[in-house]
Amino acid sequence: MSFFTTYSKKLENLIAGVIFLITFAVYFSTMAPTVSFWDTGEFIATSHILGVPHPPGSPLFLLVGKFFSLIPISSDIAFRVNIFSPIISALTISLLFLICNQFIDRIDPSDNNKFFKMWSSLTASLTFAFTHSHWFNAVETEVYAFSGFMTALVVFLIMRWSQKIHDSNHIIYLIFISYIIGLATGLHLLNLLTIPFIGLIIYFSIGKLSTKNLILTFIFSLIIFFGIQSVIIKGLPQLTASLGLVGLSFLIILWVIATIYSIKSNKTFLSIFLSSVLLIVIGYSTYFAIFIRSGQNPNIDENNPETISEAISYLNRDQYGQMTILPRKFDNLPSKVSIVGSPADDNSQFSFDQELDYMFHDIPSQASFLWNYQIKKMYLRYFLWQFAGKGDSGDPFVASVGASSDEDGVDWRQFGLPIALIMGLIGIGYHFRKNKQDAFSLLILFLMTGIAIIFYLNQDAPQPRERDYAYVASFMTFSIWIGLGIYSFINFITDSLLEKSIKLQSSYFMIGLFILFMPTRMLIANYHEHDRTGNYIAWDMAYNMLQTCEPNSILFTNGDNDTFPLWYLQEVEQIRTDVVVANLSLLNTTWYVEQLRERYKDNPFIKMSDKEIQSLDFKRWESKKISINAPKDSNNEIGKIEWELNPTYLGVALRTQDLMVLRIINDNNWNRPIYFGVTVSPTSMLNLDNYLQMEGLAYRLVNNSNQIINQNKMSDNLLSYIGDNSWFTDYDSNKYNLLDRDISKEYQRGYIFRNLANEKVYVDPQLGRLVQNYRTGFVRLSISHYLNKDFQKAEAALLKMEEIMPSSIIPIPSKQLQYQIAQVYSGVGNQAKMKYHMKELVERKDLLLEDYILYGKTFIQLLEDYDESKLIFETIYQNYKLIEQSILRRGFTATKISEKEWQDWQQSLPEIIYLLFLSYKNLEMYDEAKILLNDWINKNPADDNAKELLEEILQLESS
């Protein structure tokens, strides 16, 4: 090895280290300070207590998370576990830099352009570092950051193996890769998608090149992929069920002996195969942590996989139902029975022909759904977010790419120009021109970690959240091509120049330009949106929801976001452990019902036998009145609550969760207070509205329908907030202790609202929608006071809401709610606040014609602001005339308006004309009023009312 080669290797490693430090600093500075929404609360809690999370479990992540939770770097356990993500994500970027170098070296192995190779790789890796999805994963506790690292590590190792193929110890790389893949099964099955890429790199390195062998290699790789998934991941538990633990142990011992024998006998291929399988199994053995801990019954023990049959169900993700590639799950996909009829045999199994008919039912709809939703919206849009830009699809300059008006589309201007995308596309062409084998291998990796997932998952619409985090490995693969594109572009520029000095100068200039316009521009553009500093919304909402509940309550929650953060507070922070958090989705499962019964058997609220629980299922139901016993008092003299219960499933049945809610209400017999979180859907509240009393972030079940809200508790919770006031206006990390003294692990009224009024703290639209639950509470409290003629308290509630979360920082997504706020302000005499909200309303992008008319009338009737009403109705009138002209010239289709919509416009026109006339009249704009009325009368000569108005204007003008 030459001196220059040694020096360049050291420089390469040094740059990789610097990349780690830079990216870690960025990720750490933007890291979530505590628990976040979605799965993070569950993962942090289960890591800390070594519990059992939702299938398929991610045991390796839990073990690493447990280690980090023990490092005393913060009093906040979530902060400790969170810090692993910035570390592992920064390591991923360092590996990506090395991988880019490997691919460029395979195109140009000379040392002449080593500097430019490294800087091209540096720019590409930093570009990926600051893409949306990778950065999102890097700042919270989730498996995807760790999974991305494992993918990068496997790619790096197989590329290193191909470089060392002539060394005597090259096989160790393949063995190590097998172990990493085994370990990665304890994270996410996404890592298995690298296997076809690995197979192709091996084939192109040592195989005899032919189309037949290439196809066989790819097929063999897929066999290995499904073999690991079916034989090892799913098969070992089934094998254990057949052989028992003793039999399985004996089989493993035999395998170890055979492996040792093959190594000593120099049977190379056999030894590699046996060693690889053994190491995959050893890596996979992290799942023993899940099964062992489940047997010890931790407080979070999802699916209870402590027996072999339950473990098999857990690994198969049976909880989520059967996954099928066909048919694609387009909207209104008919049921299988409605298409192919009842099952053909006596065992309720559909025949092969029936399955085939259903798979290929309505191919045009399937194809349309596959492209328009699953590929275009749920992958291509995400891909373009990374390298072109992300923005509100309601913006006229943002391409929707399948997104609805309240979702993010593709903002081609976010990074100035989509240079990263252009360089990546150039890199693909350059790669295929210079090294078709590597390019094809990389293309397979790109497709397997992107489009192939789309085909396999067959997601239905709509999804509860954006799913871009699942395709980060695909985006990382594209970033390798960005590095190749930069390198090829620099070579093209320098090759076009004659003098060497000019070549060097131009190369340095181009590198500087790329660094400036790609990673730096992306860093600046994405920083605020990915900065979680000061974001305590999940922690605070969980705390506030728990503190809404009286001691020893039962709290029904809806899904991940109103359950996992609560689990975190209870299991990790030990806050309000007396509250029973009963997740409605999980109440559909027998294991969860059994766990709730056993965990709280000292003060039971589920009095069901094992047989009753196991027989739980849907119940056919027709709407009818039902009753449950209730305490007798002055508000309830009959001693029961009665209400009409409607079907909740397809209009014909009650779900298991509904039956369990009814059973819990009955068995509890009013011993424990029962609450429904405000996030629970109306359907899941089972029409109990008349007996649900709002107390903050939860509705309490009461025995009467006299009051829809509890004013005293609402005021105590919403208006008597705890913590230092500075939290609302500024973020100061030195004030942690002030807040910590005020929170209570026991029942205490008073909410926390940290940083909701701090413009420096980014609140994404989804979080913005979640915190509207606070606003709803404030508004309902205010309206309650208003109806009781207590106008001072009504106004005070709204003013406190404005102080805590001003609409200028966290917009009000519901126009109906904001109009209610404006109306209450008007009712209490605060015209300035009313006008402020009305002006915000008319600037919204989601308004319909009737909204503009309503708001314009409000400016006239309640605010007497004729300048504003004039602007509104002039705009509406001009739009009417433009639409009319367009329809006359181009027709309805080209104008993109339906005949029904045009009829609505025509029916509204007289009112628009009249309200615009009123605005002109009160502003003494008589000329404009005359022109308006004359134009109307010319088209409607029989309108005597308009003629009277015109006469009125003429009289006013003459006087």
Residue ranges and their predicted role:
Residues N13-V26, L122-L126, F176, T217-F225:
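Alpha-helical transmembrane segments
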Residues L11-I15, I73-F84, N112-A124, N169-I177, ...:
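Membrane-interface starts of transmembrane alpha-helices
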Residues F4-V18, N213:
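N-terminal membrane topogenic signal
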Residues P59, I71-S94, L98, K114, ...:
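Loop-to-helix entry region of an early transmembrane alpha helix in multi-pass inner-membrane enzymes
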Residues M31-F43, P53-V64, D301-N303, T533-I537:
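Extracytoplasmic catalytic/substrate-binding loops of multi-pass membrane glycan-assembly enzymes
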Residues G17, I83-D111, L153-L157, I422-G429:
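Transmembrane-helix motifs of polytopic, lipid-linked glycan transferases
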